Amino acid sequence: MNPPKSAPDAQGLSYRDAGVDIDAGDALVDKIKPFAKKTLRDGVLGGIGGFGALFEVPKKYREPVLVSGTDGVGTKLKLAFHLNKHDTVGQDLVAMSVNDILVQGAEPLFFLDYFACGKLDVETAATVVKGIATGCELAGCALIGGETAEMPGMYPDGEYDLAGFAVGAVEKSKIIDGSTIAEGDVVLGLASSGIHSNGFSLVRKIIERANPDLSADFHGRSLADALMAPTRIYVKPLLALMEKIAVKGMAHITGGGLVENIPRVLRDGLTAELDQHAWPLPPLFQWLQQHGGVADAEMHRVFNCGIGMAVIVSAADADDALRQLADAGEQVWKIGTVRASREGEAQTVVV
């Protein structure tokens, strides 16, 4: 068989010519290894670079149930690109998944990330991964693997997308599923650190309309920093609370806000009645509502409105839970109670 003929004067092509820089990928791995190493914990077997990451379930679990979660950061990334601010979105990525699996009572064990871009910028990617490692440290889980995908033509230069994957464990007898929630139980609200990672399509629309100076002072920091504040990670204080108090249900307040997330842990026939005056609406949400002309009902179904996690306990345990969470450094309020639903009523109402 004759070899294929080359076009006249054609030069040989390389992967770099196609837009993929293998050397940049190798440089990134070298940069992020120290970040990942700081997250190592008991159970990690082997180092970074294998085809698969190995983790041994801690021996303290008699009947371990694995709990998994995956999420992204959404269009908060578009604001990160606009501001050229990439140091906080990694923590957002971790928080979205570890807070989700925490709701079932799970201790996060390990985390994996996926970073996709059109052209790999090593410094930007390393900054993002450093934030991921920070989030893993705050959650007590190991960053044991990930994927960096450089895909020319898929994303504009300077842009990327993120996905995260968390796996945790809970004792089978201690799974939290909301089945014990009853009338008279108390809903506690833990303060958010800001907008977290939901509602940014509306945030960006409000910014487009208001055209504010994002570098201007906003309650002691720039408006940009207030908007980009990383999602709070509630793992350690809530795992400690679960050791002392029977937590009946939890809801991570993400897309859908308070009114759509709390019902996910309530049995049919129960409603959580929340008092919107029980906690202060943070200045950032006041700013968004004012400049966007957003109705109260829309605020409560899009944004967390200052509450990042809801915890449901018995009335008898409520004061102890408040005290323990406050001692752990959390801002927390009694924001509502559980009662029987009325005919045709939603499972969470804000009054």
Curated annotation (Swiss-Prot):
Pfam families for this protein: AIRS, AIRS_C
InterPro entries per the UniProt record, alphabetical: PurM-like_C_dom, PurM-like_C_sf, PurM-like_N, PurM-like_N_sf, PurM_cligase
Organism domain of life: Bacteria
Predominant location category: cytoplasm
GO CC annotations, alphabetized: cytosol
Keyword Iron: no
Compartment(s): Cytoplasm
Keyword Transferase: no
UniProtKB keywords: ATP-binding, Cytoplasm, Ligase, Nucleotide-binding, Purine biosynthesis
Catalytic activity: 2-formamido-N(1)-(5-O-phospho-beta-D-ribosyl)acetamidine + ATP = 5-amino-1-(5-phospho-beta-D-ribosyl)imidazole + ADP + phosphate + H(+)
GO molecular function: ATP binding; phosphoribosylamine-glycine ligase activity; phosphoribosylformylglycinamidine cyclo-ligase activity
One BP term from GO: adenine biosynthetic process
E.C. number(s) listed in UniProt: 6.3.3.1
Pathway recorded for this protein: Purine metabolism; IMP biosynthesis via de novo pathway; 5-amino-1-(5-phospho-D-ribosyl)imidazole from N(2)-formyl-N(1)-(5-phospho-D-ribosyl)glycinamide: step 2/2
Family named by the database record: Belongs to the AIR synthase family.
Record's protein name: Phosphoribosylformylglycinamidine cyclo-ligase
